[in-house]
């Protein structure tokens, strides 16, 4: 959802929009809570409060002020990620299609012939990283830029088996315009920029993908693990093949291949030396992608090529000779992409020339690596019978046409390793069947606890990582942020097919622990000053964000809060339910409380916990177990709102109701989740029951509207099991709440048979006070309350009577006493 604060005169009618007027009788948090549970996607917030807007943004709900119609229009019609600290709106909006325009953040693409193969009359526009160059398109009080591009379509094409680009593009556009936009993919690009800028220097980054190829250039101190190394020694496993030479792309993507090769070498250098290297490139022209590289960091780049390399710092318009290796300095990488043009030469002659050039390239690599220190080389080679260092790394990024070439990354240590003879056919097998798809070339990270800070976004759920080891990791890892795929199934599957592999599934209760926040994407990014206009949906591809040793763990009213916890419930309640009170009635009935009068006011069950359980697929931004843990330890820091501390019985009753709900729905996953939360509550609270009580709270009244035959009709305000040391504390507590108790609006409306022989009158208005009293006794370790549901009533007779109904009658308290059972001992309160 999104909240747009505005003047009353700007309010207009839009689809899926509701107006909320600030309620001056409620505080900021209560107003924010009410707004967050509105079911409309757009909320127009009139007579707004800045404090309410801040609360909503910190809860992950994008909330902005619109001061005119233009701002209102752009905020209503677009979805976005909002930096509420810097006041930047990152739009995720494809409306530029009505300009007959595709967009890219890759400058090199605009220098190719791609426009010959896109829709007639269309053009490709470069917008810079995160659409930075679109800022000039918007003139609002907030900074605004559009991050949407079509690079995902182009990349999918590059890695597909399709050659004709236009049909591929049309199909992709049709899909984009008829299905839900991949919103979190767009928003994640912004989030990663913010996250990586804040991680410590000892960070381990597990599973980065090409989406971060430019983002992570700023952080050489981060160690990346992508589990994608293919070594020369791995070629021996391949069946030998022949040259195919297949077309891969209609437009020229040679620069893409070169860009990825150089980036792969840079990141290999980062992992090894954690510093920025000087970059040498041989055969560099035209390398327009250097433009984007230099926007991120001012690399020292020196190049050699007879043709121009526009963005090189020092370009030598000449061929590089072997003797020139003496000019190359330490702390550098060398990219060798030398190959002369065929120019119609006979294929045998051409083949011999290519093999000779490969030998020269490898000699340049050898001489470069043998001199100095802290050097890494990426060298072009052709498929041929040759010896190479066994541990060197092979790359084969897509290019316009699959030829006989690939690339090898070699370090100074690899050069000293044993050599492995590789036949030509093994190279062809690698080239024909492999498209390297990740510039973060690195080994597998073995999932085990470490003292370092770990970032693992969307990379640990796959079947390569043992599920039990991952759960153990979540319980022992001290620092970091990881994601795991949430179990959204209904039959409690432990894994689910995802693309070509399986993902293991996890429930929040399996990974929760002290100090760890478990939340949704929008819940986590709010701690990085970001909020979203589009909440998480229960798509089946939802991820738990698990933040270890989070400094915000105790900030229960600031981050990952209960905001929006009833939104799904409201949606069902007002559109599908038998009555708008269905939820209240269901919760009471399933726990044996059959007095449904004022059930929405005097409910025996925690509605918060119930909603968090039954709609956990929608509400997992709210970290329920963290909430329970902080309450159990009495460490809740409340900043505002109508705070009510739930007693553990209310939490357990919520679990009971949720369990019945789950069984009615045949939701096996929810059954498991509810049972695990129930166990968690029992573990966190030291519950003792007065099932064999020796004292009770005796409340009698001035007058009763019903006839009675018992000598002393009264309300039992609670049963206790006290030792001699507890009595004075109990009296002190009761006297401290005496005025509150007397002020209660206690009512009675009917009589009923509590058992076959006990005739009672109901008492309304006491139950919520009972739970407040429960917590006061619990904090003092005084045993109060029984294991069964507490039903406030007055015993009238011990024989069967006919039930009576009357108008609600107020009960006036006459006296309050603490009495010992089967004794004359009593203490007046």
Swiss-Prot record:
Residues 243-425 are annotated as: 2'-O-methyltransferase activity. The active site is at 714 (for 2'-5'-phosphodiesterase activity), 716 (for 2'-5'-phosphodiesterase activity), 793 (for 2'-5'-phosphodiesterase activity), 795 (for 2'-5'-phosphodiesterase activity). Residues 689-829 are annotated as: 2'-5'-phosphodiesterase activity. InterPro entries: VP3_Rotav. One of its GO terms (biological process) is symbiont-mediated suppression of host innate immune response. Residues 552-688 are annotated as: GTase/RTPase activity. It catalyses: a 5'-end diphospho-ribonucleoside in mRNA + GTP + H(+) = a 5'-end (5'-triphosphoguanosine)-ribonucleoside in mRNA + diphosphate; a 5'-end (5'-triphosphoguanosine)-ribonucleoside in mRNA + S-adenosyl-L-methionine = a 5'-end (N(7)-methyl 5'-triphosphoguanosine)-ribonucleoside in mRNA + S-adenosyl-L-homocysteine; 5'-triphosphoadenylyl-(2'->5')-adenylyl-(2'->5')-adenosine + 2 H2O = 2 AMP + ATP + 2 H(+). It is found in: Virion. The keyword S-adenosyl-L-methionine applies. Residues 171-242, 426-551 are annotated as: N7-methyltransferase activity. One of its GO terms (molecular function) is RNA binding. GO terms for cellular component: viral nucleocapsid. Its EC number is 3.1.4.-, 2.7.7.50, 2.1.1.56. Keywords: GTP-binding, Host-virus interaction, Hydrolase, Inhibition of host innate immune response by virus, Methyltransferase, mRNA capping, mRNA processing, Multifunctional enzyme, Nucleotide-binding, Nucleotidyltransferase, RNA-binding, S-adenosyl-L-methionine, Transferase, Viral immunoevasion, Virion. Its main location: virion. Contains a bipartite N7-methyltransferase domain, a 2'-O-methyltransferase domain and a GTase/RTPase domain. The C-terminus contains a phosphodiesterase domain that degrades the 5'-triphosphorylated, 2'-5' linked adenylate oligomers produced by the host cell in response to IFN stimulation. Belongs to the rotavirus VP3 family. Interacts with VP1. Interacts with VP2. Multifunctional enzyme involved in mRNA capping. Catalyzes the formation of the 5' cap structure on the viral plus-strand transcripts. Specifically binds to GTP and displays guanylyltransferase and methyltransferase activities. Has affinity for ssRNA but not for dsRNA. Capping activity is non-specific and caps RNAs that initiate with either a G or an A residue. Together with VP1 polymerase, forms a VP1-VP3 complex positioned near the channels situated at each of the five-fold vertices of the core. This is Protein VP3. It comes from Rotavirus A (strain RVA/Chicken/Ireland/Ch2/1979/G7P[X]) (RV-A). The lineage of its organism: Viruses, Riboviria, Orthornavirae, Duplornaviricota, Resentoviricetes.
């Amino acid at each position: 959802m999104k909240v747009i604060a505005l003047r009353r005169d700007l309010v207009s009618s839009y689809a899926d929009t509701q107006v909320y007027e600030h309620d001056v009788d409620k505080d900021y948090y209560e107003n924010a809570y009410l707004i967050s549970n509105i079911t409309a996607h757009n909320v127009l917030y009139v007579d707004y409060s800045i404090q309410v807007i801040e609360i909503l943004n910190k809860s992950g709900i994008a909330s902005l002020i619109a001061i005119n119609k233009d701002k209102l229009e752009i905020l209503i019609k677009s979805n976005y990620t909002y930096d509420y600290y810097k006041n930047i709106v990152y739009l995720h909006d494809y409306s530029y299609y009505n300009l007959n325009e595709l967009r890219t953040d890759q400058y090199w693409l605009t220098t190719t012939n791609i426009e010959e193969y896109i829709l007639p009359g269309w053009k490709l526009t470069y917008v810079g990283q995160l659409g930075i160059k679109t800022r000039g398109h918007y003139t609002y009080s907030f900074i605004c830029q559009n991050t949407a591009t079509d690079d995902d379509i182009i990349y999918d094409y590059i890695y597909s088996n399709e050659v004709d680009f236009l049909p591929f593009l049309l199909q992709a556009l049709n899909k984009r315009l008829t299905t839900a936009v991949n919103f979190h993919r767009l928003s994640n690009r912004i989030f990663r920029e913010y996250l990586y800028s804040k991680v410590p220097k000892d960070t381990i980054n597990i599973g980065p993908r090409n989406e971060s190829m430019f983002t992570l250039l700023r952080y050489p101190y981060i160690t990346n693990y992508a589990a994608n190394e293919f070594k020369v020694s791995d070629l021996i496993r391949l069946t030998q093949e022949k040259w195919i030479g297949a077309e891969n792309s209609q437009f020229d993507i040679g620069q893409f291949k070169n860009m990825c090769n150089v980036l792969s070498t840079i990141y290999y250098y980062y992992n090894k030396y954690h510093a920025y290297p000087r970059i040498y490139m041989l055969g560099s022209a035209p390398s327009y992608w250097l433009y984007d590289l230099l926007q991120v960091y001012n690399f020292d780049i020196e190049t050699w090529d007879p043709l121009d390399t526009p963005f090189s710092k020092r370009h030598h318009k000449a061929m590089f000779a072997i003797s020139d290796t003496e000019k190359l300095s330490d702390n550098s990488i060398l990219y060798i992409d030398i190959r002369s043009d065929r120019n119609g030469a006979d294929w045998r002659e051409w083949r011999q020339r290519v093999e000779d050039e490969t030998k020269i390239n490898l000699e340049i690599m050898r001489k470069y690596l043998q001199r100095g220190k802290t050097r890494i080389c990426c060298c072009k080679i052709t498929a041929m019978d040759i010896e190479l260092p066994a541990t060197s790394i092979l790359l084969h990024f897509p290019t316009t046409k699959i030829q006989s070439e690939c690339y090898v990354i070699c370090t100074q240590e690899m050069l000293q390793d044993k050599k492995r003879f590789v036949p030509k056919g093994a190279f062809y097998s690698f080239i024909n069947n492999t498209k390297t798809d990740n510039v973060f070339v690195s080994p597998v990270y073995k999932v085990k606890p470490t003292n370092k800070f770990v970032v693992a976004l969307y990379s640990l759920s796959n079947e390569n990582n043992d599920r039990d080891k991952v759960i153990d990791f979540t319980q022992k890892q001290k620092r970091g942020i990881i994601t795991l795929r949430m179990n959204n199934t209904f039959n409690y599957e432990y894994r689910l097919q995802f693309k070509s592999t399986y993902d293991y599934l996890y429930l929040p209760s399996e990974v929760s622990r002290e100090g760890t926040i478990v939340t949704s994407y929008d819940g986590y990014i709010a701690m990085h000053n970001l909020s979203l206009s589009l909440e998480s949906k229960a798509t089946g591809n939802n991820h738990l964000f698990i933040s270890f040793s989070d400094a915000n763990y105790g900030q229960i009213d600031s981050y990952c809060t209960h905001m929006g916890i009833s939104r799904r419930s409201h949606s069902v309640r007002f559109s599908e339910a038998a009555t708008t009170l269905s939820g209240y009635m269901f919760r009471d009935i399933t726990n044996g409380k059959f007095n449904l009068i004022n059930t929405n006011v005097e409910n025996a069950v925690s509605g918060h916990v119930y909603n968090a359980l039954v709609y956990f697929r929608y509400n997992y931004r709210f970290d329920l177990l963290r909430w329970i843990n902080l309450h159990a330890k009495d460490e809740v820091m409340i900043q505002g709102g109508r705070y009510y501390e739930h007693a553990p019985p209310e939490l357990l009753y919520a679990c009971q109701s949720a369990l019945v709900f789950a069984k009615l729905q045949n939701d096996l996953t929810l059954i498991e989740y509810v049972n695990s939360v129930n166990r968690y509550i029992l573990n966190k609270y030291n519950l003792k029951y007065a099932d064999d009580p020796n004292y009770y709270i005796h409340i009698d009244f001035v007058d009763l509207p019903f006839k009675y035959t018992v000598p002393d009709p009264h309300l039992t305000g609670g049963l206790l099991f006290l030792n001699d040391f507890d009595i004075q504390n109990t009296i002190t507590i009761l006297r401290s709440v005496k005025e509150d108790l007397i002020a209660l609006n206690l009512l009675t409306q009917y009589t009923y048979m509590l058992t076959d022989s006990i005739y009672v009158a109901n008492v309304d208005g006491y139950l919520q006070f009972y739970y407040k009293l429960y917590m006061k006794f619990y904090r003092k370790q005084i045993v109060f309350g029984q294991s069964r549901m507490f039903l406030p009533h007055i015993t009238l007779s011990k024989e069967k009577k006919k039930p009576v109904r009357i108008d609600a009658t107020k009960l006036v308290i006459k006296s309050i006493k603490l009495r010992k059972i089967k004794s004359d001992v009593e203490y007046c309160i």
